Amino acid sequence: MRMTMEEMKNEAETTSMVSMPLYAVMYPVFNELERVNLSAAQTLRAAFIKAEKENPGLTQDIITKILEKKSVEVNFTESLLRMAADDVEEYMVERPEPEFQELNEKARALKQILSKIPDEINDRVRFLQTIKDIASAIKELLDTVNNVFKKYQYQNRRALEHQKKEFVKYSKSFSDTLKTYFKDGKALNVFISANRLIHQTNLILQTFKTVA
């Protein structure tokens, strides 16, 4: 049975989503290791990237097994959200024009606010302010994306338009998750949705980096 285009896109998104721990958790480890042994760090990074590409989710499995073996009780989804705000070199747009650098800055700002959710969620007043800040950051990022669209022409505009639509879709999903949270109080679902939105933010940068 052949997959539809939509099913293929969903599978691709899910596959890349499970690879989030590679850059959110392991990349900072590799960066620290580079200060001690550059060659070993580069070899290890390349090995993890290759293994993750061939077996999506492998990094998460390895980290989870290590935590289990050490009997460390940790909310992995929450921890991932706290760590996901850092810049990932592979996703940063390198073009020097102000519009592209602003794209990096707006994406960074949104990710940083989202990563604070675990610290704010139990304080209703602070969390409501955080939600307002997230809404503003989403709008600012989309405005910046639209500004780049207006100023620059792309052969692969469809890929950019698709990624923008995906980002908007996950933004709305995040908003719906928040509404549900205020009814059922399940913070984990908010963390999951926030991680997905951070991932979509990175994919916007990656798409611009690829076609720009």
UniProtKB/Swiss-Prot annotation:
Gene3D superfamilies assigned: 1.10.12.70, Nucleotidyltransferases domain 2
Location, primary (coarse class): cytoplasm
GO molecular function: protein kinase binding
Signal peptide range: none
GO biological process: angiogenesis; apoptotic process; Golgi reassembly; regulation of Golgi organization
Keywords: Angiogenesis, Apoptosis, Cell membrane, Cytoplasm, Golgi apparatus, Membrane
InterPro entries, per the entry: PDC10_dimerisation_sf, PDCD10, PDCD10_N
Domain of life assignment: Eukaryota
Topology of the protein relative to the lipid bilayer: Peripheral membrane protein
Annotated localization: Cytoplasm; Golgi apparatus membrane; Cell membrane
Transmembrane segments: none
A single Gene Ontology CC term: Golgi membrane
Family (UniProt): Belongs to the PDCD10 family.
Purpose: Promotes cell proliferation. Modulates apoptotic pathways. Increases mitogen-activated protein kinase activity. Important for cell migration, and for normal structure and assembly of the Golgi complex. Important for KDR/VEGFR2 signaling. Required for normal cardiovascular development. Required for normal angiogenesis, vasculogenesis and hematopoiesis during embryonic development. Promotes cell proliferation. Modulates apoptotic pathways. Increases mitogen-activated protein kinase activity and STK26 activity.
PANTHER family named in the record: PROGRAMMED CELL DEATH PROTEIN 10, TF-1 CELL APOPTOSIS RELATED PROTEIN-15
Protein name in UniProt: Programmed cell death protein 10
Organism: Xenopus laevis
